[in-house]
């Protein structure tokens, strides 16, 4: 299973706690909001502005390397931290993920010729009781970053599809 598959499962599966139709979800957040590390997924409640970080791991080695990082996934705006990945890593998550982090596993299943992903919270995340909800200006910036990310990706896919033809951008 790839990181993209896990990300898809976490955001597109209606059984996921981070379904994109009910949360603000932006991938790979690093710059623009003052984080000291990159967040694989930043999930924010549109009502309470409470933030959750999701760290995606697809191998035991990747999970072990995370232990060497200095930031330890802490930010005062993050209420909960989850580690997410394939169900086959559940044992490694329990062994190597920080004890305050929740664990979400993903199982792909082929149904009628198409793959569906099922997310399961295997351990609830502990709540950072000193967290501070995001401010409206930060939400605005996050949505701006998500918008920029979408249109950058759209442009790359468009160029790939059209082999660079009809490129009107000269910047």
Q: In which residue ranges do the predicted regions lie?
A:
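Catalytic cores of nucleic-acid endonucleases
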Residues: 51, 58-107
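Short, well-structured alpha-helical interface segments that form or flank functional binding sites
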Residues: 5, 36-39, 73-76, 80
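Non-catalytic C-terminal interaction segments of nucleic acid-processing enzymes
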Residues: 4, 8-19, 97-171
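Active-site beta-strand-loop-beta-strand hairpin of nuclease catalytic cores
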Residues: 34-53
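A short acidic/basic microdomain associated with nuclease active sites
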Residues: 16-34
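Short, flexible loop/turn elements at secondary-structure junctions
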Residues: 29-31, 43-45, 58-60
């Amino acid at each position: 299973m790839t990181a993209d598959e896990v990300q898809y499962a976490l955001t597109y599966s209606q059984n996921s706690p981070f379904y994109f139709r009910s949360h603000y979800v932006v991938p790979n957040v690093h710059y623009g909001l003052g984080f000291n590390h990159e967040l694989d997924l930043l999930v924010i409640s549109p009502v309470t502005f409470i933030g959750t970080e999701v760290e995606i791991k697809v191998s035991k080695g990747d999970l072990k390397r995370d232990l060497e990082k200095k930031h330890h996934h802490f930010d005062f705006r993050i209420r909960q931290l989850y580690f997410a990945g394939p169900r086959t890593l559940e044992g490694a998550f329990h062994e190597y993920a920080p004890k305050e982090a929740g664990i979400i596993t993903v199982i792909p299943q082929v149904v009628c010729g198409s793959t569906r992903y099922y997310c399961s919270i295997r351990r609830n995340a502990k709540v950072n009781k000193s967290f501070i909800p995001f401010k409206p200006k930060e939400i605005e910036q996050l949505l701006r970053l998500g918008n920029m990310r979408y249109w950058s990706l759209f442009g790359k896919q468009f160029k790939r599809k059209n082999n660079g033809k009809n490129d009107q951008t000269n910047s």
